Amino acid sequence: MWVQPALDPDLGLIYANTGNPWPDYNGSTRGGDNLFTSSIVALDAMTGKYRWHFQSVHHDLWDLDMPTPVILFDQVYAGQMRKALAAHSKQGWVYILDRVTGKPLIATEEKPVPQEARQKTAATQPVPAGDPTAPQCAEPVAQYERGCMFTPVWTDTKIAQPSAAGDWAPGAYDPQSGYLFFTTGVSTRKFSPTGRVSVPGTREYGLITALDSRTNKQVWQKEVPYLAGFGSGVLATGGGLVFHGGSDGYFRAFDSKTGEELWRFQTGFGADAPAATWETGGEQYVAIAAGGSRDGLKEAKGDLVWAFKLGGKLNPLNGPPAPPTVVTTAAPPGTGVDRPRD
């Protein structure tokens, strides 16, 4: 189990995300779908008894499990109010399921994918309708074979995006608009059965995306100069704002309907923690911890918790060094090391 499960107390179910199979990138010794890896599994909260599962990647060869928490919400599909679950995957897809049965509420098709007999690849993979939150093919790089989602690897010259940096941070849901919000990291990695390594000269960046939960279609998307799939994630408030903390130290607020940046505050360090909001004394507060926790991103380290309200008086700090946006050093072949930099 990757992260803390979600709980529906009315249904008496918990929803757990499971990790990918091992070895991560070599499927030659583990044929079949490898259940229940890279899946969402629903269990009876009182007994632990299995209720249903949905596998997002069959026979995972790319470390594309889902380390971000699922989101539980209610929404109308086909004219009926349904108890839904949204799961954002590292490949930049959002699976919207009926959390009672595990069946997709947004059409999901088992599509044929490229094959590699030595890797014992699955014949198909589940692909949801709608828009992905990340590019599905690598940007071209000289001397490398360009790969797309579910390109199998056996040689060490194939590259792919968004790679396993896709999404680790929590998403959010706004019941007023019906929008889902997610962060994504986009990086280029060279894959082989022994691991994935950085590709020098390629850029790394992040995306913040709003999707309409009724259609799984993109409403807006913003690019940021760091791997936004790690760290803070997003917080949606009833006032129509989406908050996000970045590796560049900024705590930002966006208009939830348009994506327009309305406010930013420099915390002085990598603002990686999920934001929190609460009300006390009739006033709403929003808080975030700024500690620069991601060693691989070479963030400025700190030890601060910032709390904000309307009319607050504190001044921002000086910004930390900007996180690198271009990979400068490749990891040693076969190590699987993901993000070394000069």
Walk through the language-model features, giving the residues of each.
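Noncatalytic, solvent-exposed loop/strand surfaces
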Residues: M1-R341
